[in-house]
Amino acid sequence: MRQTITEKIFSEHVGEAVFAGQIIESAIDMVIGNDITTPISIKQFELSGAKKLANPDGFAIVMDHYIPTKDILSANQAKISREFAYKHDLKNYFDEKDMGIEHALMPEKGLVVPGDVIIGADSHTCTHGALGAFATGMGSTDLAFAMITGRNWFKVPPTIKVIFHGKPAPHIYGKDLILEVIRLIGVDGARYKALEFCGDALEHLDMDSRFSLCNMAIEAGGKSGIVAVDEITKEFLADKNLRAEPKFHYSDEGANYEQILQIDVSKLDPVIAYPFLPSNGKSVREAVRDDIAVDQVFIGSCTNGRLSDLRIAAQILKGRKVARKTRLIITPATQKIALAAQKEGLWDIFVEAGAVVSNPTCGACLGGYMGILGVGERCVSTTNRNFVGRMGDRTSEVYLANSAVAAASAVAGKIADPRDL
């Protein structure tokens, strides 16, 4: 019987052919925790009486949400993870010395390998599907179970196939494609489904755009997002010291899909998700007509804090100034990205434009720190969620957009189309 890429990955891990709807127990290749979710997992690990990790090299702790710590509570949270990492001599432990947002850092370090089954105690773990892996978020207790046993149970998800056709116009990126998908199917349109992204338009999407695409699968309710390995993937992996030998899986012709969605990306304008749902997508042209003034612009996160995002922003900001009544915060996703941006002179452009450039952190995205919104404030953000109170006060508003729209809006002081600058 013909299989989807997701069914093939699970079949390889289980040792027999499995299909959508089956309950299975699978080996886990990589388990990922962070400074917020891992302490709960550690508590359960210790309560179980376990003395060692089932697969130490397949476990990573990435300190990213409140790093450097913002207060005593976050410092104590971080301390739990640090002490556990030191006690177990954890190889894949990343803190201030080699920091980054987990969903950008893990692929950068070669710790995400095509064909993997990956779980993380963070809902945007689905990002890693861009490398042809099955990756999904779970709770901290599930993470603890995998830490102890190296395994976990799954219901093999059915798949929605999303076929992107055409060549994207200038300033159309993976962020716009996934916002369009979510606009079409809604925030629960892919509930417990694998979103398989394919089509000739992917030839025009670099890995950074593909990570953005898979990152927001969860915003449609998806169990995972996945892109099969191609030459663009292989080029990205070429300089990585991969944790294991990659395994390339591809969906069979005639595999069973629950739904097939086709989108002509050549007709897309940049998409902006209005408050308070990622599905509330509108064309940037409509947003410009609405004349929406913004107090803050944030460029960063596991969705759009990669080097290409910073380059896009720099192209727009060069020789320009951030509007007087608007503040711009730029947060590179990893130290490596930050260093590359410095070497390319991007930081000079940002600072001269009037932006604040921070260390890598989730920070503002979750309303944690370093960019919290006040009463009634509006923000154009390259992040992935715009729920009520997501980035600050409950009366604040977040508009999700790509990095070009964000940078243009910072200059204009209101939502702007980068093609107009």
Descriptions of predicted regions:
Residues 1-421:
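Fe-S-dependent hydro-lyases/dehydratases of central metabolism
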